[in-house]
Amino acid sequence: MGTHVIKMPDIGEGIAEVELVEWHVQVGDSVNEDQVLAEVMTDKATVEIPSPVAGRILALGGQPGQVMAVGGELIRLEVEGAGNLAESPAAATPAAPVAATPEKPKEAPVAAPKAAAEAPRALRDSEAPRQRRQPGERPLASPAVRQRARDLGIELQFVQGSGPAGRVLHEDLDAYLTQDGSVARSGGAAQGYAERHDEQAVPVIGLRRKIAQKMQDAKRRIPHFSYVEEIDVTDLEALRAHLNQKWGGQRGKLTLLPFLVRAMVVALRDFPQLNARYDDEAEVVTRYGAVHVGIATQSDNGLMVPVLRHAESRDLWGNASEVARLAEAARSGKAQRQELSGSTITLSSLGVLGGIVSTPVINHPEVAIVGVNRIVERPMVVGGNIVVRKMMNLSSSFDHRVVDGMDAAAFIQAVRGLLEHPATLFLE
């Protein structure tokens, strides 16, 4: 038997370090060739690291949330044959491996499967039902168990694991549900008014850490100013309904988003200073002819901004189809690195949750972001009469270092004019 060291691979584009997001294995596991060992993140792209060989895990080289250098030791395996690490008294024992979690002493083999199945209930009978792990300690569980826990609304932090090294099994979830139900029944109506003293320490790692760093950097570096304008989209919504009725079956249903993209594309012809990126270190503003619109998209892991490239070159349905593809790729974690960078202006919409006013954060190094609020029906005065109209606010933010307030207001007024008179969206 020999020792095989797997190093953090170079995943391209000159990346010098990555963040370890999640282990898919633990010390003592046997792994096959090409089996996924871990997930790492660079910028906003998550990459799975497979094992190049089969073997048994001897040591893990880091904890989730840790930043690791490319070429650094990721994992050690015991393999058949000589391995790639020369055996010596010093090398026989890894110098400073980091286990996935603090290892418990291994227990003797269980005598019968029935005893293993009953272990979770025995543990829960002897311990407090809401006892949790130490802050920062990640519960061990398979992806299937984690997914089931999410579906059931269970925090794994509070589930006692009966597997090796405290690993949470499906039986532990069953036991937790059974015990949780009995507590709720015994508590009666007053249970909802009981004092709570539990707390949970959630490490800010992976995509959430990247979002935090990017938002902090943008707010620290960019002097934001926001501008809010209301828009009458009654005629636009009538046009959208007509197009969907006539062409929706053949070309797909249109949402409001491709109309907004089209309005921005047309308006930016007269305001190229807003379709730009500002290098504040070189003090250079680069204006772009191509309109690459970042589409702020919420995923299960956090905010992603896939890029609709060359929005000026597509019609409504072309942009709608590409936006749908990018949004699905972002939500499923399959977006490519190049699809998440290179935008020249960003469009942010919270849909029906859009509220009345928002103050979106600029996607640095861009100089503008257009925020879309929800559509509401309101009484408006038109031609001296009070009528019901569909109204929507645009809440936009700009970099005041390179964008003057008058230019920002004029740009939004141009977008407003296009949306309130939708036929002008298609005049060249």
From Swiss-Prot:
Required cofactor names: (R)-lipoate
Keyword presence, Cell inner membrane: no
EC number(s) recorded for this UniProt protein: 2.3.1.168
Cofactor binding comment, as recorded: Binds 1 lipoyl cofactor covalently.
Lipoyl-binding domain segment(s): 3-78
Keyword Protein biosynthesis: no
Low complexity composition bias: residue spans: 89-120
Keyword annotations: Acyltransferase, Glycolysis, Lipoyl, Transferase
Enzyme class: transferase
CDD domains: lipoyl_domain
Pfam families named among the record's database cross-references: 2-oxoacid_dh, Biotin_lipoyl, E3_binding
Domain of life: Bacteria
Molecular function terms from GO: acetyltransferase activity; dihydrolipoyllysine-residue (2-methylpropanoyl)transferase activity; lipoic acid binding
PTM annotation (N6-lipoyllysine): residues: 44
Positions of the UniProt region annotated as Disordered: 88-145
Entry-linked Gene3D superfamilies: 2.40.50.100, Chloramphenicol acetyltransferase-like domain (3.30.559.10), E3-binding domain (4.10.320.10)
UniProt GO BP: glycolytic process
Catalytic activity: N(6)-[(R)-dihydrolipoyl]-L-lysyl-[protein] + 2-methylpropanoyl-CoA = N(6)-[(R)-S(8)-2-methylpropanoyldihydrolipoyl]-L-lysyl-[protein] + CoA
Active-site residue list: 400, 404
GO cellular component: cytoplasm
Subunit structure: Forms a 24-polypeptide structural core with octahedral symmetry.
Family under the similarity heading: Belongs to the 2-oxoacid dehydrogenase family.
Function per UniProt: The branched-chain alpha-keto dehydrogenase complex catalyzes the overall conversion of alpha-keto acids to acyl-CoA and CO(2). It contains multiple copies of three enzymatic components: branched-chain alpha-keto acid decarboxylase (E1), lipoamide acyltransferase (E2) and lipoamide dehydrogenase (E3).
Alphabetical list of PANTHER family matching this protein: DIHYDROLIPOAMIDE ACETYLTRANSFERASE COMPONENT OF PYRUVATE DEHYDROGENASE COMPLEX, LIPOAMIDE ACYLTRANSFERASE COMPONENT OF BRANCHED-CHAIN ALPHA-KETO ACID DEHYDROGENASE COMPLEX, MITOCHONDRIAL
Name of the molecule in the record: Lipoamide acyltransferase component of branched-chain alpha-keto acid dehydrogenase complex
Originating organism: Pseudomonas aeruginosa (strain ATCC 15692 / DSM 22644 / CIP 104116 / JCM 14847 / LMG 12228 / 1C / PRS 101 / PAO1)
Lineage: Bacteria, Pseudomonadati, Pseudomonadota, Gammaproteobacteria, Pseudomonadales
